[in-house]
Regions:
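A short glycine-rich, Lys/Arg-flanked "PGG" loop and its adjoining helix->strand segment in the class I
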Residues: 136-147
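Conserved SAM-binding loop and adjacent beta-strand
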Residues: 31-47
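Conserved beta-strand signature within the Rossmann-like core of class I S-adenosyl-L-methionine
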Residues: 148-156
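Conserved Class I S-adenosyl-L-methionine
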Residues: 163-184
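Class I S-adenosyl-L-methionine
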Residues: 177-208
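Class I SAM-dependent methyltransferase SAM/SAH-binding core
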Residues: 60-112
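A short SAM/SAH-binding and catalytic strip from SAM-dependent methyltransferases
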Residues: 120-134
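N-terminal, positively charged/glycine-rich alpha-helical extensions of SAM-dependent methyltransferases
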Residues: 1-29
Length: 208
């Protein structure tokens, strides 16, 4: 019997195919069974921080999933948004919301090919976490960003310390500027489940 998708299974993912399988099974009910029940506020917070640092479109929403961060950006006045995710099933849900101009099913641990322009902004909410993506993928994001692009990426706080994100950003010192770390709650006050006290670091910077 296939286990019902949940956060613990998501954190335990090991391979790209494991990731695709879990989110294919979860896509239809992801927002009702996870985002709403857990009071998942991280996408909104990442979008707000992106706008606060001066972020504008066109934006690439990395790990867009069902479009929660895209919806938040749209409400904040950002209208030119593309979506990228490993899960085609999750992007099908996002497509139906009519938020995104273009949608790409891609693995960001590999070089990214989208369309023939670079982005003025990149956001990511919930992708840099346990069982998902490590710090090396950040260089692939920089490759599709314009000079001066604003970038806001959430990183699960435990994942940050366990997987060398601070070291990676030191290595990127000549490629980025205005690096800031913002510690935020992943879930809101209405969350009653395990992990309700989990934190994320929203990393903001500009490409030079």
């Amino acid at each position: 019997m296939i286990k019902k998708p949940n956060l613990n299974l998501a954190y335990a993912l090991r391979t790209v195919q494991d990731n695709r399988n879990l989110y294919a099974a979860w896509a239809k009910d992801y927002e009702t069974e996870f985002a709403h029940q857990m009071d998942y506020v991280l996408p909104q917070k990442v979008a707000e921080i992106f706008v606060e640092i001066g972020g504008v479109g066109p934006v690439l929403d990395v790990g867009a999933g069902t479009g929660l961060a895209g919806e938040a950006l749209l409400k904040l006045g950002i209208e030119s948004i593309d979506a990228l995710d490993l899960s085609g099933a999750m992007l099908e849900v996002a497509f139906n919301k009519k938020i995104y101009k273009n949608l790409f099913t891609k693995d960001i641990t590999q070089p990214i090919k989208t369309i023939n322009y670079l982005y003025q902004g990149i956001i990511s909410s919930g992708t840099f976490t346990h069982g998902h993506v490590g710090p090396d993928a950040i260089e692939n994001l920089l490759a599709v960003a314009q000079e001066g692009a604003c970038i806001a990426l959430s990183v699960n706080r435990d994942h940050w310390f366990k997987n060398g994100f601070s070291i990676k950003f030191q290595e990127l010192d000549d490629k980025i500027e205005r690096l800031l770390l913002h510690e935020v709650s992943i879930y809101g006050d209405n969350s009653k489940a395990d992990h309700r006290n989990d934190l994320a670091i929203v990393v903001t910077f500009k490409k030079v």
